[in-house]
């Protein structure tokens, strides 16, 4: 017991990806070696309340953990509670705002504790679809055409902004919250009316909106793993969505119709280029630990980066662990390597 690493696994969160986080956490918890790790599970409700949870992991998966009051402990001072001070490494299995945007990473830095995942800066940049594209372009990675604005600008002159977007991008246009993942709040607009409606939907999730030109191509993803400064890219995989695009439902509910092909059936040149771009993108945002990088591959062979996910999903159908399995690292080994690498990582802020 005394030789075990004290691991604090954080799940849930306040974002629209709360449910995905819970499923990912369940899958990670299932494979953690109890002989090596003493796990403290820390749940965050959608309202932002923090609880220590000591109940059945199945209740994390189905979201009923908040009702399991016999196994909840709350109303504690996060910084003062000895349970937190005794944690050796934090593993945030969180997605979206307040989870992979640098917010909780800053908390871990203030606690002077190592943690799984990218740091504060890289998490924030990776979460913001506009800033990340600027960084990708700076290192020569092709991006598709895009246009962005903030909510106050939209409310002042939405018709003018719509005119500019149509001229710059043409239809169809993908409308996205700038800071959200798992395709939450994303729509595909085919005309002016759909564009206006799609922006209003996206504004529910963020005050900054990015519009992207449609890229006709295959959706190729690549997993990145960093261990002690060495960055590796997995064999890429392809997503074949059952709908017009790989939306939230297709990613996490529509398992029967949406398909993934690993390795992606692409030529060696494209595969090598995608793996190279994945590493470059990861390094461009100064990433650490892990990320998943998404691309489009057109029929003419052009490659465009879509986005980087600094805390990719770990559900049973998530691409990140599946791509590493195809590359030769099993799910359980992958989780352990990520934790062990985090343990050796120096916290950037020393108090």
Question: Which residues make up each language-model segment?
Answer:
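Hydrophobic beta-strand scaffold residues
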Residues: 39, 114-115, 143, 173, ...
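Phosphate-binding site of ATP-dependent enzymes
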Residues: 187-276, 297-304
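A glycine- and small-aliphatic-rich helix-loop capping segment at beta-alpha/alpha-beta transitions
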Residues: 106-115, 191, 196, 326-327
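Active-site nucleotide/adenylate-binding loops and adjacent lid/helix of ATP-dependent enzymes
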Residues: 2-11, 15-16, 23, 84, ...
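ATP-binding N-terminal substructure of ATP-dependent carboxylate-amine bond-forming enzymes
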Residues: 1-116, 120-121, 125-127, 131, ...
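Solvent-exposed alpha-helix faces
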Residues: 26-27, 200, 279
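ATP-dependent carboxylate activation and anion-phosphoryl transfer catalytic cores
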Residues: 2-5, 11-12, 87, 267-351
């Amino acid at each position: 017991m005394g030789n075990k690493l004290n691991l604090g696994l954080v799940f849930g969160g306040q974002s629209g990806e709360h449910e995905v986080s819970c499923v990912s956490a369940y899958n990670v918890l299932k494979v953690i070696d109890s002989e090596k790790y003493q796990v403290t599970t820390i749940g965050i409700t959608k309202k932002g309340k923090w609880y220590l949870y000591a109940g059945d992991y199945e209740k994390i998966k189905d979201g009923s953990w908040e009702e399991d009051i016999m196994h909840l402990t709350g109303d504690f001072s996060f910084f003062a509670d000895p349970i937190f001070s005794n944690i050796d490494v934090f593993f945030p299995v969180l997605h979206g705002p307040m989870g992979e945007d640098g917010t909780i990473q800053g908390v871990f830095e203030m606690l002077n504790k190592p943690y799984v995942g990218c740091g504060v800066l890289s998490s924030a940049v990776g979460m913001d679809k506009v800033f990340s594209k600027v960084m990708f372009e700076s290192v020569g990675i092709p991006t598709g055409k895009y246009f962005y604005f903030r909510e106050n600008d939209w409310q002042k002159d939405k018709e003018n902004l719509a005119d500019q977007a149509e001229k710059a991008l043409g239809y169809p246009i993908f409308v996205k919250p700038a800071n959200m993942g798992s395709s939450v709040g994303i729509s595909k607009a085919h005309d002016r009316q759909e564009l206006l409606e799609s922006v209003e939907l996206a504004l529910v999730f963020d005050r900054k909106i990015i519009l992207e030109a449609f890229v006709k191509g295959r959706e190729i993803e690549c997993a990145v793993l960093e261990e002690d400064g060495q960055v590796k890219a997995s064999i890429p995989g392809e997503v074949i969505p059952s709908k017009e695009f790989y939306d939230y439902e297709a990613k996490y509910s529509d398992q029967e119709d949406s398909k993934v092909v690993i390795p992606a059936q692409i030529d060696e040149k494209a595969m090598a280029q995608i793996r190279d771009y994945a590493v470059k993108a990861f390094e461009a945002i100064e990433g650490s630990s892990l990320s998943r990088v998404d691309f489009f591959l057109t029929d003419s062979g052009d490659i465009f980066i879509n986005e980087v996910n600094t805390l990719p999903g770990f559900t049973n159908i998530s691409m990140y662990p599946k791509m590493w399995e195809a590359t030769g690292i099993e799910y359980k080994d992958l989780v352990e390597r990520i934790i062990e690498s985090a343990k050796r990582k120096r916290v950037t802020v020393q108090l």
